[in-house]
Amino acid sequence: MLAKFESMMSNKVQTDDDFTQTQNPFTLFASWLEEATISEINDPNAMALATVDETGLPNVRIVLLKNFNSTGFVFYTNYESCKGQEILKSMKASLVFHWKSLRRQIRIRGLVEQVSPEEADAYFQSRPYGSQIGAWASKQSQLLEDRFVLEKEVSRYTADYAIGNVPRPPYWSGFRIKPLFIEFWRDRPSRLHDRLLFTRDFLEQNNWKKQRLYP
């Protein structure tokens, strides 16, 4: 996983003082993610993804960050799934990273765009063969009569794509969350935690406003 984030992690933030001194939230994010990669037992790139349905009722689930840079945070999914449909309707989402081993969390809120077909194709071809077949076999979020039905679909697509590359399903791709708000939280004694909020008014704005928040 480190290789995917290498370009952002080269500007690693090391000291506690830099928590408040940094002016670039992506640099601080890269530093924290790199530390989490060392300290977290499983999936340091796991993040809670929050969306809302057409009635405004929220939904949240854990997904995996697959790439990030100064334009946003990328994950992949079935566009016909619940989360895919909710995002496509609102084009807004929120993320939370929580690293218990570091006693830190990051909240991200922003607008969403679809990744390019070329970007999605490249990532899909990097996935294990079984995961590629699963993307075809699973009608994500739809009702499943029993496990045998799913296994039959897996067998069917395994036979269909036994030779050569597995093409990316047309309904399977990625989203990029382009942040307007990024908040860093760090545990401190007596519940007097550190909170550092970066905001910008529009996506093209490169200069972030930085503010401290009461814990």
From Swiss-Prot:
Protein purpose: Catalyzes the oxidation of either pyridoxine 5'-phosphate (PNP) or pyridoxamine 5'-phosphate (PMP) into pyridoxal 5'-phosphate (PLP).
MF-aspect GO terms: FMN binding; pyridoxamine phosphate oxidase activity
Enzyme Commission designation: 1.4.3.5
Record-linked Pfam families: PNP_phzG_C, PNPOx_N
Keywords, alphabetical: Flavoprotein, FMN, Oxidoreductase, Pyridoxine biosynthesis
PANTHER family to which the protein is assigned, alphabetical: PYRIDOXINE-5'-PHOSPHATE OXIDASE (PTHR10851:SF0), PYRIDOXINE-5-PHOSPHATE OXIDASE (PTHR10851)
Highest taxon in the source lineage: Bacteria
Family, as annotated: Belongs to the pyridoxamine 5'-phosphate oxidase family.
Assembly and oligomerization: Homodimer.
Reported cofactor(s): FMN
Annotated positions binding FMN: R61, I62, V63, L64, L65, K66, Y76, T77, K83, Q105, Q140, S141, W185, R195
Catalytic reaction(s) noted: pyridoxamine 5'-phosphate + O2 + H2O = pyridoxal 5'-phosphate + H2O2 + NH4(+); pyridoxine 5'-phosphate + O2 = pyridoxal 5'-phosphate + H2O2
GO BP annotations listed: pyridoxine biosynthetic process
Designated name of the protein: Pyridoxine/pyridoxamine 5'-phosphate oxidase
Residues that hold substrate according to the record: K66, Y123, R127, S131, R191, L192, H193
Pathway: Cofactor metabolism; pyridoxal 5'-phosphate salvage; pyridoxal 5'-phosphate from pyridoxamine 5'-phosphate: step 1/1; Cofactor metabolism; pyridoxal 5'-phosphate salvage; pyridoxal 5'-phosphate from pyridoxine 5'-phosphate: step 1/1
Membrane-spanning ranges: none
Co-factor binding comment: Binds 1 FMN per subunit.
